């Protein structure tokens, strides 16, 4: 229907064994996943391990979120015909995937191994999942409201990374309020020339002065390949990572997920990651 046709499921996450998950802004498409020479995107995800998944925590939040998406009327099986597996084209595709995996495993042996990821992660004080409504119609901008309040309550700094900036007056006003309260307030986004989204780059070029007028400092990324990370650094103990772009589609139309992580170690690690890109801006 016309009032639903623009709704999109924009979340990106993978849950394993009900106790570990990856969540971020990375699409499952070739140039989001690989290191290709001609075209690729730079992205960011976060790995979360829950040692006690029976308790109320972010993994239980995410599992409940998945179940609610799965059960709603707008979701349906693409097909349930097991006979498709007997088609020659399907068998050929399955064989090709098996062969490509063997080639990958042989070329990248260092990536195929069992690992205790708890040795490579940091213990956090708290992780909270923030989400938009999941229906396909126009949405209350829950994620935007939540992020806005987190940023307004920062004591010293807020650093945003987003591939796109397409705001309305309410969103500009939120940033203006943050700028009044926070001395170090900046955003890094793709320059118009470096942006892989022509609509996003056109709106940014047209409204850049409006963004500057909010009081935020802008860094334009010029790394040659489009930057696709969506993150917010707040003071020295809060990190926000997920799928939400600083645009009206993420605010009002799409399903979106952002993780709010309270941890000084994660904050420091995220800052180091953000700065590698800001050096090219």
PLM region spans:
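Charged, low-complexity intrinsically disordered terminal segments
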Residues: 1-12, 16-281
């Amino acid at each position: 229907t016309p009032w639903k046709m623009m709704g999109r499921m924009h979340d990106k996450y993978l849950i394993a064994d009900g106790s570990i998950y990856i969540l971020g802004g990375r699409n499952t498409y070739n140039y989001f996943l690989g290191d290709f020479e001609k075209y690729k995107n730079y992205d960011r995800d976060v790995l979360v391990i829950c040692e006690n998944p029976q308790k109320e925590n972010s993994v239980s939040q995410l599992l409940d979120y998945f179940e609610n998406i799965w059960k709603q009327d707008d979701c349906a099986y693409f097909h349930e015909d097991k006979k498709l597996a007997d088609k020659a084209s399907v068998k050929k595709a399955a064989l090709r995937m098996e062969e490509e995996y063997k080639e990958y495993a042989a070329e990248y042996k260092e990536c195929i191994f069992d690992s205790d990821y708890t040795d490579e992660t940091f213990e956090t004080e708290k992780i909270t999942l923030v989400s938009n409504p999941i229906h396909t119609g126009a949405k209350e901008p829950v994620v935007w409201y939540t992020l806005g309040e987190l940023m307004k309550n920062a004591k010293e700094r807020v650093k945003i990374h987003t591939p796109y900036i397409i705001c309305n007056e309410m969103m500009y006003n939120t940033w203006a309020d943050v700028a009044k309260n926070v001395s170090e307030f900046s955003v890094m986004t793709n320059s118009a020339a470096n942006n892989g989204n022509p609509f996003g780059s056109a709106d940014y070029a047209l409204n850049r002065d409006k963004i500057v007028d909010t009081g935020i400092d802008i860094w334009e990324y010029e790394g040659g390949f489009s930057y696709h990370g969506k993150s917010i650094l707040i003071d020295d103990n809060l990190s926000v990572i997920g799928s939400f772009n600083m645009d009206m589609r993420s605010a009002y139309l799409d399903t979106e997920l952002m993780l709010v992580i309270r941890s000084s170690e994660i904050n420091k690690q995220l800052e180091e990651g953000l700065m590698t890109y800001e050096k090219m801006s």
